[in-house]
Amino acid sequence: MDINEAVDQFYKALNDIIAGDIEPMKEIWSHADDVTYLDPSGAFLVGWDDVLASWQKQANLNIGGDVHPENLHVIEVDNLAVTHNFEIGTSHLRGGNEPVNIRVTNVFRKEDGRWKIISHHTDLMDILE
């Protein structure tokens, strides 16, 4: 899998989270102790267990809606890759179609020949604070 396929896999997994399914997100993330997640509620999480708990909380909300990356910029060097982009879409958390438009940075590391996310940093989203 190349880095662009990994990005696609992450956004599929993110849309699955929005629909309440956490399983694909578990596949794209590294389960290492050094992973980090600066989540949309403002939390700064370190380690797979804490990162997983945040994603599970979001999946349990079963928000509905969809997001996709725009203006994707990829930097790839050896076994690390960094992506910067906007996440654009809609959220149905409050019963309507609230726009989503945030900035995102992802860091991927190649583990056993596959790209895995080791860091995800988003802008704050008041719907998840």
Where are these regions (language model features)?
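A beta-strand edge to alpha-helix "cap/lid" segment located at domain peripheries
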Residues: M1-P24, S30, D34-E129
